[in-house]
Amino acid sequence: MNQNRFWKQAFSFVLLLLVYGVYQFGNKQAELKQPGEYDDLLSLQQAVSAQRSKVWFNETQFTVYKLLADDTKGSRHQRFLVKREGLPTLLVAHNIDLAPRAPLRPGQSLYIKGRYEWNQKGGVLHWTHHDPRGVQPGGWLRLGEEKYQ
């Protein structure tokens, strides 16, 4: 009977260690995904190579390559090109009717969260703003600690 009790206690101890390990691993994963620390480059690379659209991506770092004229047809969009190693040059269309204009300059580093749409020129990053209806998760542009959403 003592041997049976020993195995029950040993099993309980191992189970407790396993639960603790899973809990700690989950916390470490959450810590990795804090803004500016987690990069969704792989998701974007896969979307580009598979020519997929409507792909939401987490905050990812880019460099402003070129500022373009605003798109003023329909909803107004601040437009600019960004670069990132491992990706083609991408167009960003940031809706300035829903979010503030970001003060950008070429060569500047920024973080973008939004949605990728494939096209033959590489693709467009958009939904870099809140969703006024609260249906989509929404995104942002982030310069330093300042978010434009």
Regions found by a protein language model. Name each.
Residues Q3-Q149:
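OB-fold and OB-like single-stranded nucleic-acid-recognition modules
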